[in-house]
């Protein structure tokens, strides 16, 4: 029998399911405690979240870069891929604001603009995968994902790390639509031959509208970052598109809700948060123009402490997003890929609100674990790498606080009901 919130061991039980947390804390609220579990359709009150970092402020460059971004997307033809009303909704949502809240004024203008462009593209791409016409057309979504994989493989087609990720992507495409994907896979392999032979440029490969825009961002990134470091961000993108396929496979098979452990693993990649942390390599490269700073070597980057730090930061942002997106994506749109829904189902919570409150407890634990991993990483590293490590952790903290401020203010989520202190939540958050 699954544990329930009546048990004092609930927090400990759920932690032990998917990580090694051992500290137990009391839930902050007992809202909706009664003999009957509330259905998912009932009112959800987002738990009050207070982060241990300063409140994020919107970068004054945001509106200018947002306008440039939508002009760029229009020039790539993406505005013609969605209904006019949907396009206007994307514009009104000010999707670049998440970058504006997460990146301070000291960021280089070219980095800020790149992040605005990629982020807005990502929101639209993700919507196409979840509820656009791609959601009903597996052939189209698989084709886009194979093209993205080709882009990521192009510069280093024999890289073992990338080949391993690529194999899992190709296997998933076959598992989802074996007959319909044959021609697409044949084209992918033919294009990979060209990549290995260097017989033509990546720009010469014919691609769809969305993937052409992604290629534009990718080529700008690899022009600036040494080849030995581009593999890092390429892997994060591969994990993201692989998770998109997993979600699509689950929808096709009408799979039941995953357990918490499996969901957390999938969510770590499906949120496409990792690239924002690894993008720091380009920020560091730009800093090197002005002052000496060493990149984090692969021995440290792929080491236990660095990976623990990045995984914890990724979990924090993804779980936080699940709380705020729950009314929109799960209650209204019926998407079960949400941690609130998963915890609600697996742990027999009395309400979705209580499931959200439990997740906040875990979220604060993950922040503490991120900070602990940072201290361990810094202690283990030579002093010459400390500045780069500090840039990485600052970026993690900034994206956590910036993402929170974006979710609090964005019309995309429009959460207005909170379980927490009786005072105005935004007022408390700004103190």
Swiss-Prot record:
Family from the record: Belongs to the terpene synthase family.
Keyword Magnesium recorded: yes
Cofactor remark: Binds 3 Mg(2+) ions per subunit.
Reaction catalysed by this enzyme: (2E,6E)-farnesyl diphosphate = (-)-alpha-gurjunene + diphosphate; (2E,6E)-farnesyl diphosphate + H2O = 5-hydroxy-alpha-gurjunene + diphosphate
Stated role: Catalyzes the conversion of (2E,6E)-farnesyl diphosphate (FPP) into the sesquiterpene alcohols (-)-alpha-gurjunene and 5-hydroxy-alpha-gurjunene. Other unidentified sesquiterpene alcohols found to be catalyzed by MTPSL4 may arise from carbocation reaction intermediates along the catalytic cascade to gurjunene being quenched by a water molecule, yielding formation of the alcohols.
GO MF term (any one): terpene synthase activity
Cofactor: Mg(2+)
UniProt EC number: 4.2.3.184, 4.2.3.72
Species of provenance: Marchantia polymorpha
Record protein name field: Alpha-gurjunene synthase
């Amino acid at each position: 029998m699954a544990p329930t919130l009546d048990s004092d061991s609930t927090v400990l039980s759920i932690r032990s399911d998917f990580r090694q947390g051992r500290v137990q804390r009391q839930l902050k609220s007992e809202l909706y405690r009664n003999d009957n579990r509330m259905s998912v359709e009932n009112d959800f009150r987002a738990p009050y979240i207070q982060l241990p970092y300063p409140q994020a402020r919107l970068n004054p460059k945001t509106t200018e870069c947002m306008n440039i971004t939508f002009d760029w997307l229009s020039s790539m033809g993406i505005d013609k891929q969605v209904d006019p009303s949907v396009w206007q909704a994307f514009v009104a949502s000010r999707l670049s604001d998440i970058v504006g809240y997460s990146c301070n004024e000291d960021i280089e203008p070219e980095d800020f603009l790149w992040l605005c462009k990629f982020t807005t593209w990502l929101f639209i791409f993700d919507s196409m995968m979840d509820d656009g016409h791609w959601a009903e057309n597996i052939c189209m979504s698989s084709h886009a994902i194979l093209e993205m994989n080709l882009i990521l493989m192009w510069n280093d087609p024999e890289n073992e790390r990338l080949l391993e990720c690529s194999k899992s992507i190709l296997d998933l495409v076959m598992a989802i639509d074996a007959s319909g994907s044959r021609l697409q896979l044949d084209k992918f392999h033919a294009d990979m031959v060209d990549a290995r032979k260097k017989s033509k440029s990546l720009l010469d490969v014919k691609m769809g509208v969305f993937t052409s825009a992604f290629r534009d961002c990718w080529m700008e990134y690899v022009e600036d970052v040494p080849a030995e470091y581009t593999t890092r961000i390429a892997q994060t993108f591969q994990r993201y598109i692989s998770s998109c396929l997993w979600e699509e496979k689950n929808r096709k098979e009408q799979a039941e809700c995953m357990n918490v452990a499996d969901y957390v693993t999938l969510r770590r990649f499906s949120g496409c948060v990792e690239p924002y942390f690894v993008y720091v390599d380009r920020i560091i490269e730009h800093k090197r123009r002005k002052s000496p700073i060493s990149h984090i070597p692969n021995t440290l980057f792929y080491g236990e402490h660095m990976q623990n730090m990045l995984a914890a930061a990724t979990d924090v942002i993804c779980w936080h997003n699940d709380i705020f997106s729950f009314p929109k994506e799960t209650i209204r749109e019926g998407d079960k890929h949400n941690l609130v829904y998963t915890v609600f189902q697996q742990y027999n919570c009395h309400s979705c609100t209580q499931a959200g409150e439990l997740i906040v407890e875990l979220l604060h634990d993950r922040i503490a674990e991120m900070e602990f991993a940072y201290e361990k990483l810094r202690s283990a590293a030579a002093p010459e790498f400390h500045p780069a490590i500090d840039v990485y952790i600052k970026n993690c903290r900034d994206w956590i606080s910036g993402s929170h401020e974006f979710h609090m203010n964005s019309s995309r989520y429009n959460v207005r009901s909170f379980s927490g202190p009786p005072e105005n939540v935004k007022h408390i958050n700004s103190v």
